[in-house]
From Swiss-Prot:
Lineage: Eukaryota, Metazoa, Chordata, Craniata, Vertebrata
SAM domain segment(s): 11-78
Domain Rho-GAP: 641-847
Organism: Canis lupus familiaris
Name of this protein: Rho GTPase-activating protein 7
Biased composition regions of type Basic and acidic residues, renumbered to the chain: 414-425, 513-523
Subcellular location: Cytoplasm; Cell junction, Focal adhesion; Membrane
SMART domains assigned: RhoGAP, START
Length: 1091
């Protein structure tokens, strides 16, 4: 019994320390600070009122920790203070979920924005315990809750909320006090108390408070020894699970959803700008669709419009077949309307739509057909078209010569027709234009078996629908051979790298020429999970098309290629209403806050539904936040390389060859039965692996077996050093599908995904979207989400590897001797399968900001940190007469101040690139470091400046498009450029104010960039916020220059941890690419002269 009490005390101290760690990790660091400052206990009810936007489970998880700290405060248990943040610390940026607290960077402490009493003279009673009277004060030194200490604790905390310097009065302090009281008195010695408990005198400001020190006097040495002994015992003791109070079952009342409500501020002018049309006011008229413009990489907030080309049969205005096909595909996929208040379940709406459809059918005669000239060359658009009535006999059917589709009588074979109401109107491809059925004839099915539009066998015995069927089949077979030869001729061409290119020279496969539609429905193999076409014309090449002359400096284009997969990006583009909720659009401060809320939500759910021995306080802090030394991967390029290393090398977490394998399967192999289920040939798979290791950027998969490529893709994820879900969180994912109820699993999964490292989350999103497209062709490949999960779950979760690592040799030997897995293994495999299948089915909802975050708008929306306008940049100087030119001059002065001080205070950072890399912490703004990379370039400063300004496409392999928005003066302009991202993630959009200087001392040049908000710059992706970007070019003799690049930017969708681990490597890689562009130019010039 004598030894049991110290053990209980040690365990309670461990719980207190881990409770403080949990509070910091979940967005409540202010309470951990109060406990370490010996200012507990606190009033739990006040905390609940302060966080009323949280749900019940999250509040209960918070209160459990606070009650633990209250108990420890009464027991006089102390923990070691949280270590102070140093300049080289990798600790997370302080972040509080509540918007009523702010972090004072000068004093490194939390303070309240308004007075709010969280202290009470009594503790909250335990659940089910009767209410007790307030604790009485005592004169003994052992008392922890004397009246004096309570009042002084309140005064000390309220002083944290002071934002200005206030007058200070001396107190009356003569009584003896405990160490806790002494520490409080030392802080509040300048405060004066009056008789009323609720009224206090003026209190010190946070700056004044930071100058005070807590005096421990005689207790200091004893406390240090206690701390050391505590830490030693914590290493040897394991946390014992403690039973938790049972929670009431959640309310079973269903969620009540009201009807559509018009948003505030949506006046008539706003509705007119959004092209909104009142449904009831249509009156049978069609909606005019605006004209299509030159295609660019567009964000989902923009609505692409349809083509406005002339619909006449003129040969001059008729586009090529590929152009027309692309236009139709783009229009039908992206043209949309935002109908505010539209009720799709209103019966009157259905009646109007049905009446409109009937009018559409009656507006076209059923005997209209378009004739193609006899000398028409297959594969090209006809030079002239004529329409008329069907002949009385013989030619009462028409064939689409490009696809082999046969149309029965009465079907209009051309999809763009003239209308009496609107001559230039675009008719939707999937609208009903005929009451008769459409039949398709293919050369790979028996001629006696024809399927009608509904999928049933056509009754050919009762009526001879096609009198010249043999001739038609003969022509179709010939056409198929020609089209195959035509597609093979251009199959090696790659994607276009321009963001404004809308068409390619030819489609990459016959499937992409035309999307078959049967009775207004696309075939499953041609649709992705969102209903968009999978076979839209793919950008032909992985090698960007040259936009230069091809001679001289244009020969220096980088040899590193980037995959252009625009169809994958466009098919999974979020809707207009959900674009702001996408994770990849959030700022770094919002991501930091979102991660802490996700940890809070996940902890609350797991503690509520999992057994007490399945979780503990130690679960709270994910291990990926800790610094881990990784081995060297110089001898590997693809397989076995961590995703973080891929980001540091190329800027993208997935290697280019793996992305190309996914694109090959998505474009050409979705009709293969049992894809990912049937095994490939080992020798061919090994050959594919060697191809990936040797040719990282460009691997040609043409002619490869779909099953070989799919197996190679599985092996890639299986060979990762740790599972895609990470070693720590894989077990958490399995617990979610073993213990959490079905209706709560989606919330738990969204929270767990936010705890993944950024590169793992991005790869998971890409993979899930890709697998959802595979399941969209389930009628052909027979692969449902569950079937795919059975095949891929072991590779993604590393189930077998985890079992071997977590099991002892004796246990593994016993399992092998029994020849069957135990029940735990079966449950984990089932949970992994169910989890992956659920993630595939709900992939679009997993990567969105939870709706609960909108309840704490004060703390979340303020963290967005949008770029400033030109006028706002001038106001940063607090000078009414200042403008953006004064801001730019200040930037130039600060740059040369760094140079004059020889970059004092910068910390060196190791990188695999051949450049010097260092960083410097910045106290203002978002939690982002300022990075600096330096390299020697074999060119003069003027040449380097020209390359940075005018020739970005020669060294930036991710560049999609660029243009100058506005020229402000001879050395200042607004510049916009777009960079590619790994599909299906949206492109990155930069709008910067840039200025350059060439008349600097010693022949140096400088280029400065800062993001701005400009009304003439359309949003064509995720808008990046460049806080600071500087290029300094100094001559160093022998025709060489020293290039120094400094950058601090918020790329959106990344945690602070990602910027610490990866962003610096990207800065170093950028200067290396700039240098290589000149090195390649010099090498090619020498080779030309030698010839």
């Amino acid at each position: 019994m004598c030894r049991r009490k110290p053990d209980i005390m040690i365990l309670t101290q461990i719980e207190a320390k881990e409770a403080c760690d949990w509070l910091r990790a979940t967005g409540f660091p202010q309470y951990a600070q109060l406990y370490e400052d010996l200012l507990f206990p606190i009033d739990i009810s006040s905390v609940k009122r302060e966080h009323d936007f949280l749900d019940r489970d999250a509040i209960e998880a918070l209160c459990r920790r606070l009650n633990t700290l209250n108990k420890c405060a009464v027991m006089k248990l102390e923990i070691s203070p949280h270590r102070k943040r140093s300049e080289d610390s990798d600790e997370d940026e302080p972040c509080a979920i509540s918007g009523k607290w702010t972090f004072q960077r000068d004093s490194k402490r939390w303070s309240r924005l308004e007075e709010f009493d969280v202290f009470s003279s009594k503790l909250d009673p335990a659940p089910g315990a009767p209410a007790e009277a307030p604790l009485k004060t005592a004169a003994s030194h052992e008392s922890m809750l004397t009246e004096l200490s309570e009042r002084q604790e309140v005064a000390s905390v309220l002083s944290l909320s002071s934002t200005g310097s206030l007058p200070v009065h001396a107190p009356h302090a003569g009584d003896a006090a405990t160490p806790r009281t002494n520490s409080v008195i030392s802080v509040c010695s300048s405060g004066h108390f009056v008789g009323n408990d609720d009224s206090f005198c003026s209190l010190p400001s946070p700056k004044e408070l930071s100058s005070f020190s807590f005096s421990m006097k005689g207790q200091e040495k004893n406390a240090k020894s206690k701390t050391r002994s505590l830490l030693k015992r914590m290493e040897s003791l394991k946390l014992r699970g403690s039973p938790h109070s049972k929670h009431k079952a959640p309310s079973k009342l269903g969620l009540i959803i009201s009807g559509p409500i018009l948003q505030e501020g949506m006046d008539e002018e706003k509705l007119k700008q959004l092209n909104c049309v009142e449904i009831s006011a249509l009156n049978g008229n069609r909606i005019n669709v605006p004209a299509v413009r030159k295609r660019s990489v567009s964000n989902s907030t923009q609505t692409s419009s349809s083509s406005s080309q002339s619909e006449t049969s003129s040969a001059v205005s008729t586009p090529s077949p590929v152009t027309r096909t692309r236009s139709l595909s783009a229009c039908n996929k992206r043209v949309g309307m935002y109908l505010e208040g539209f009720d799709p379940f209103n019966q009157s709406t259905f009646n109007n739509v049905m009446e409109q459809n009937c009018k559409n059918r009656e507006s076209y005669p059923e005997d209209t057909v378009f004739y193609i000239p006899e000398d028409h060359k297959p594969g090209t658009f006809p030079k002239a078209l004529s329409n008329g009535s069907f002949p009385p006999s013989g030619n009462n059917s028409s064939v689409n010569w490009r696809t082999g589709s046969f149309h029965g009588p009465g079907h209009i074979s051309l999809r763009r027709e003239n209308s009496s109401d609107s001559p230039k109107e675009l008719k939707r491809r999937n609208s009903s234009s005929s009451m008769s059925s459409r039949l398709s004839i293919y050369d790979n099915v028996p001629g006696s078996i024809l399927y009608s539009s509904s999928g049933d066998l056509a009754d050919l015995e009762n009526e001879d629908i096609f009198p010249e069927l043999d001739d038609i089949l003969y022509h179709v077979k010939g056409m198929q051979r020609i089209v195959n030869q035509w597609s093979e001729k251009f199959s090696d061409e790659g994607d276009s790298d321009s963001a404004l290119d809308s068409v390619s020279p030819c489609p990459s496969s016959p499937k992409q020429i035309h999307l078959d539609v049967d009775n207004d429905r696309a075939t499953p193999s041609d649709l992705d999970s969102t209903g968009n076409s999978l076979n839209e014309p793919e950008e032909p090449s992985d090698i960007p098309e040259r936009r230069d002359s091809g001679v001289g400096a244009s020969l220096t284009r980088s040899n590193r290629h980037r995959l252009r997969w625009h169809s994958f990006q466009s098919s999974h583009r979020p809707s207009l209403n959900s674009v702001s909720l996408q994770i990849n659009c959030q700022s770094v401060a919002q991501m930091n806050l979102l991660q802490k809320y996700s940890l809070l939500k996940l902890t609350a759910l797991l503690e509520k539904y999992t057994p007490s021995n399945k979780h503990g306080f130690s679960w709270a802090v994910p291990k990926f936040m800790k610094r881990i030394k990784v081995p060297d991967y110089k001898d590997r390029n693809v397989f076995g390389v961590p995703l973080t290393v891929n980001v540091q090398r190329t800027g993208q977490p997935l290697p280019q060859s793996i992305q190309q394998a996914m694109r090959y399967l998505r474009n050409h192999c979705l009709d293969q039965v049992g894809l990912f289920r049937k095994s490939g040939v080992k020798s061919r798979i090994q050959a594919l692996r060697q191809m990936n290791e040797s040719a990282i950027d460009c691997v040609n998969y043409e002619g490869q077996s779909a099953y070989d490529v799919a197996d190679m893709l599985k092996q890639y994820f299986r060979d990762l050093p740790e599972p895609l879900m990470t070693n720590k969180l894989s077990e958490t994912f399995l617990q979610i599908y073993q213990c959490v109820p079905k209706d709560q699993r989606l919330q738990a999964m969204k929270a767990a995904i936010m705890l993944l490292p950024d590169e793992n989350r991005e790869v998971l999103q890409t993979l899930l979207y890709f697998l959802s497209d595979v399941t969209a062709a389930v009628k052909e490949n027979q692969m449902t989400p569950t079937n795919l999960a059975v095949c891929l779950a072991p590779s993604l979760f590393h189930l077998n590897t985890l079992k071997r690592e977590n099991s002892s040799p004796r246990v593994m030997q016993r399992k092998q001797s029994l020849g069957k897995p135990d029940q735990k293994d079966l449950n984990e495999n089932l949970a992994a399968t169910q989890g992956l299948a659920h993630m595939i089915a709900e992939c679009k909802k997993l990567f969105q900001v939870p709706e609960e975050m909108s309840r704490c708008r004060n703390s979340y929306t303020e963290q967005e940190l949008k770029p400033l306008t030109l006028e706002a940049l001038g106001r940063l100087r607090n000078d009414e007469s200042a403008d953006y030119q004064h801001f730019l001059q200040d930037c130039v002065d600060s740059l040369f101040k760094e140079v004059k001080e020889k970059f004092k205070g910068w910390v060196s950072y190791s990188t695999s690139e051949q450049a010097e890399l260092s960083y410097k912490k910045v106290s203002e703004g978002p939690p982002l470091r300022l990075w600096r990379s330096t390299i020697e370039v074999p060119a003069m400063p003027e040449e380097i400046l020209k390359r940075l300004l005018k020739e970005q496409h020669l060294w930036d392999v991710d560049l999609l498009d660029s243009k100058v928005i506005e020229i402000l003066d001879s050395q200042t302009e607004i510049y916009q450029y777009v960079q590619n991202s790994m599909a299906p993630h949206p492109a990155r959009d930069y709008v910067v104010l840039r200025t350059w200087r060439t008349n600097l001392p010693k022949g140096a040049c400088a280029l400065l960039l800062t993001s701005v908000d400009h009304d003439r710059a359309p949003v064509v992706g995720v808008r990046v916020n460049v806080l600071l970007s500087r290029y300094l070019i100094e001559p160093c003799g022998s025709g060489k220059s020293k290039l120094t690049y400094m950058c601090r930017a918020d790329l959106r969708g990344h945690m602070p941890e990602w910027y610490t681990k990866s962003f610096g490597h990207l800065c170093a890689a950028e200067v290396v690419k700039i240098r290589d562009s000149f090195s390649n130019q010099n090498t090619e010039t020498k080779d030309t002269k030698s010839r």
